Amino acid sequence: MTVLIDQNISHLIVPQIAFLFDQLTHVKTLGWIDWNDHNIFMSAKKQQFDAVITLDEDFNKLLLQHGTPPKVIWLKTGNCSTARLTEIIIAHKDAILGFLSSQDFDCLELYG
């Protein structure tokens, strides 16, 4: 599974959770750091990312407008540290991996 991390999450999380995914990329790596959500979503779609991990509800709205790919993993945690986001993602790894392999759902909301 190829997963993109949105700009509202620090790029420092990548090495902490990379083991969970086949490919994990931060928007910073792609040079998309100052792009708006629509451009990020549509570029992720064009490049066939399986999912976007974000803190931003706009991605769910874009998903409803444009469909998958990518699916959306929406971290509804509010502002918290990169360490805390890492803990939340790892704690929910089974749900995330099940979601990514499922055809039934397009958005996974995670709470911390």
Q: What spans do the regions from the language model cover?
A:
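Glycine-rich loop at the start of a catalytic domain that most often binds anionic cofactors/ligands
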Residues: 64-69
